[in-house]
């Protein structure tokens, strides 16, 4: 009995030394509960990400495993290196940009697309190492940051509606309503409403519940074939290490690479600041302890993610659900990472999820991201016009890159045209000029 108590005390002592639980006013039990809570809110990514990257021609079974691995790697590294209750996983939005635009619309091999993700992540890593990253966040106006986030939300929402069959291509009107009497369309819409209703009732696993319910209903209707629950992890050799670094390192993909870098910069940095602020760790300027370590983990996770065959990795805002139940240290993130490793053995379940079951999650994420438009000052046209252009041009041009480019250019035009030059930061002007050069010398040829 005394040996058991000694072992338990030793384990608690190690956790205290690594995570400083008492200093953060928490306990191991609270951190574990917080880890489970965060995991339940974001585990949907292991079902949705393979569906999206499968559009690019990637092996969905292999992507399922690499999604679990990179989520585990990033989350555990964040917990141990930065001691923050923030989990990481492949970014929603950038995965859709990669699959639907870079590969499908631009016609590039997915290996080249992964190369673009890699170079964007390397750029982000360099910005982090040389401390330029936080300077960019501080100097790019809220209207453009919100426009980018909301535009990606509209883009994801459109992809969700398309995958559910709610909207279909129409040569006369571009898009039109699909067959709303089709059971797959109805199940896709049902999945979205399940998420919306459960989330409004503060049920953390709303997305997971929706995917399970719609998949079960699909199975009852014959769309889904039962392949078991537990199995050895599928091989990942078809996706790991197939990144085309040489083919993607060219001027023609500069805009795509920059888009991956810029979006990941805003997405992850904003999430880190938001979650740490909710945990009471950030100061009034948005700075938090071990910020440099957290930004480094975020960057290196994206570099690693491209090599193992998954899209850009980012900090997940769902981490705030774990914070809401008491998560304050990196132990929360480590628990999330361990749970992602365990999920690897549930690959048959991931293979059963039909596209319309994942569509509801896409639409819901679109809603969450688009809601940030409320932060725009709509009374000031020099701020609202660029935000609007940035947001709507992403789905309408079917390109996140073009939306970002036009947003920065319009921002400069509006400020110069109204004589408000003091509102222009060097960062915004430089980015806008780079996009103008891209349009004139690259896109025009």
What function would you assign to each model-found segment?
Residues 40-44, 81-91, 126-127, 202-203, ...:
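Short helix-coil transition sites and intra-membrane helix breaks within transmembrane domains
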Residues 51-63, 101-112, 251-254, 354, ...:
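Helix-coil boundary and interhelical linker segments in multi-pass alpha-helical membrane proteins
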Residues 106-216, 220, 334-445:
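Membrane-embedded alpha-helical modules
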Residues 2-3, 71-92:
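Juxtamembrane transmembrane-helix boundary signature
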Residues 2-62, 175-177, 208-292, 433-437:
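Helix-loop-helix hairpins and the membrane-proximal interhelical loops
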Residues 11-45, 49, 70, 91-149, ...:
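Helix-loop-helix junctions within the multi-pass membrane cores of secondary transporters/permeases
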Residues 56-76:
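Loop-to-helix transition at the N-terminal end of transmembrane alpha-helices
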């Amino acid at each position: 009995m005394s040996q058991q108590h000694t072992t338990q005390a030793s384990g608690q002592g190690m956790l205290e030394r690594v995570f400083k639980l008492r200093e953060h006013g928490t306990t191991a039990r609270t951190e574990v509960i917080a880890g489970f809570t965060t995991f339940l809110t974001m585990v949907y990514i292991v079902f949705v990400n393979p569906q999206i990257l499968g559009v690019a021609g990637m092996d969905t079974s292999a992507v399922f495993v690499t999604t679990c691995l990179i989520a585990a790697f990033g989350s555990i590294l964040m917990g141990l290196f930065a001691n923050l209750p923030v989990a990481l996983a492949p970014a929603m939005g950038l995965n859709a940009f990669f699959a639907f635009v870079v590969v499908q619309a631009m016609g590039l091999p997915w290996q080249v697309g992964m190369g673009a993700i890699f170079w964007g992540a390397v750029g982000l890593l360099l910005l982090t190492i040389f401390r330029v990253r936080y300077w960019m966040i501080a100097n790019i106006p809220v209207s453009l940051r919100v426009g980018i986030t909301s535009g990606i939300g509209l883009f994801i929402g459109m992809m969700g509606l398309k995958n559910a069959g709610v909207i279909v291509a129409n040569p006369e009107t571009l898009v039109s309503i699909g067959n709303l009497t089709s059971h797959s369309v109805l199940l896709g819409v049902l999945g979205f409403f399940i998420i919306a209703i459960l989330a409004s009732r503060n049920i953390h696993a709303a997305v997971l519940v929706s995917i399970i319910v719609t998949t079960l209903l699909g199975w009852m209707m014959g769309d889904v074939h039962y392949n078991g629950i537990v199995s050895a992890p599928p091989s990942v050799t078809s996706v790991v290490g197939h990144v085309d670094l040489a083919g993607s390192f060219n001027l023609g993909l500069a805009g795509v690479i920059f888009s991956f870098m810029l979006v990941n910069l805003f997405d992850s940095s904003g999430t880190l600041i938001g979650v740490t602020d909710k945990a009471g760790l950030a100061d009034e300027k948005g700075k938090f302890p071990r910020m440099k370590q957290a930004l480094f983990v975020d960057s290196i996770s994206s570099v690693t993610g491209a090599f193992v065959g998954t899209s850009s990795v980012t900090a997940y805002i769902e981490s705030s659900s774990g914070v809401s139940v008491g998560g304050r240290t990196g132990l929360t993130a480590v628990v999330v990472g361990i749970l992602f490793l365990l999920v690897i053995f549930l690959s048959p379940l991931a293979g059963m999820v039909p596209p319309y079951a994942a569509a509801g999650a896409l639409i819901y994420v679109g809603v969450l991201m688009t809601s940030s438009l409320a932060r725009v000052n709509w009374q000031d046209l020099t701020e609202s016009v660029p935000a609007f252009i940035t947001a709507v041009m992403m789905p309408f041009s079917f390109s996140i890159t073009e939306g970002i480019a036009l947003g920065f250019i319009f921002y400069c035009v509006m400020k110069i045209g109204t004589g408000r030059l003091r509102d222009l930061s060097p960062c915004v002007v430089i980015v806008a000029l780079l996009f103008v050069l891209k349009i004139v010398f690259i896109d025009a040829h």
